[in-house]
A protein has these predicted regions:
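N-terminal "arm"/small-domain region of PLP-dependent enzymes with the aminotransferase-like
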Residues: 1-65, 73, 155
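Active-site glycine-centered loops adjacent to acidic/histidine catalytic or metal-binding residues
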Residues: 191-193, 229
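Conserved core of the PLP fold type I
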Residues: 57-183, 194-209
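A general structural signal for well-ordered alpha-helical segments in protein cores
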Residues: 43-44, 59, 67-72, 96, ...
Length: 292
């Protein structure tokens, strides 16, 4: 008798752990979509301020996120409506996990598109929920009739839509996403992890549409190591989410560093613009290759 094996859930035993590649030094790593350099590289005065900030951070105290000023910075820079309440996660992954936990009733379903971010399906399985995956069209566009049909048939408690989609990089038509939100009887999460690289956002709808959650992260704009995601939604959702989020899920260093970084958002935007230009350049060079 193996006492440990006997108490672990059978469905978890057959899962595969997420593997982070162990790459040699100097290897160019692109799979995680990290910024290739420190966001303040070349700004010696800001790097010095950053170091001083870390020294002064009250790491002997538990963090008080609401009093840290981070919500105000997020609202001002990203235009989050006053009607929307904000929740922070230790990366967007944590928010995905707890939003799934929030609706994990018996026989509840999660709906997503395929292919998309793997953590949607993973968390559905983790909480014993059926995951309904709706395949994209061959050109990776959204098969809206199939999605609407799946919503009507399965009545999912939670729907995830990555906007733009990950890993395909395709951004669906806004009116298609709006149609999904209108058709849903449960919560719709519009995951804008890559929203900084697109011209459109559902953040202005946050708090206005009761069943909508708009989720973003600072990871893709140069701060993957800080592990901070944020979600904006109506009080009816966020009030319930607050009951299950850990009280100290953000740490003092991440809060201080994120707030400092957001105060210098002009530099961050310059970095984003540089990445956009590089994206266009690489695409143009790839199109010159006959074998692609």
């Amino acid at each position: 008798m193996n006492r440990v094996a006997d108490v672990i859930r059978d469905d978890i035993k057959v899962m595969t752990a997420y593997q982070v590649a162990d790459l040699p030094e100097g290897f160019i790593k692109l799979d995680a979509m990290e910024c290739p350099h420190h966001p303040f590289a070349g700004y010696e005065s800001l790097l010095s301020e950053w170091a001083d900030l870390a020294k002064q951070a009250p790491i002997h105290l538990y963090p008080h996120t609401a009093k840290s000023g981070i919500y105000e910075e997020l609202r001002e820079i990203f235009g989050i409506p006053d009607k929307a309440e904000i929740a922070l996660g230790n990366g967007s992954d944590e928010l995905i996990q707890f939003l799934t936990m929030l609706v994990a009733k018996p026989n509840a379903r999660v709906l997503g598109i395929e292919p998309s971010f793997v953590m949607y399906r993973h968390n559905a399985a983790l909480y014993g929920m059926e995951y309904v995956g709706v395949p994209l069209n061959p050109d990776f566009s959204l098969n809206l009739p199939a999605v609407l049909s799946a919503i009507e048939q399965h009545q999912p408690s939670l729907i995830f839509i990555a906007y733009p989609n990950n890993p395909t990089g395709v951004c669906f038509k806004r009116e298609e996403v709006e149609a999904v939100i209108r058709a849903a009887t449960g919560i719709v999460v519009v995951d804008e992890a890559y929203g900084a690289f697109h011209h459109d956002s559902f953040l202005p709808w946050a708090g206005e549409v009761e069943n909508l959650v708009v989720m973003r992260t600072i990871s893709k704009i140069g701060f993957a190591g800080l592990r901070m995601g944020y979600a904006a939604a109506s009080p009816s959702i966020m009030g319930e989410l607050a009951k299950i989020l850990p009280p100290y899920n953000m740490n003092q260093l991440s809060l201080a560093a994120a707030k400092f970084s957001l105060k210098h958002h002009q530099i961050i935007q310059q970095n984003i613009d540089t990445l956009k230009n590089e994206r266009s350049r690489v695409m143009n060079e790839l199109l010159k290759l006959n074998r692609l």
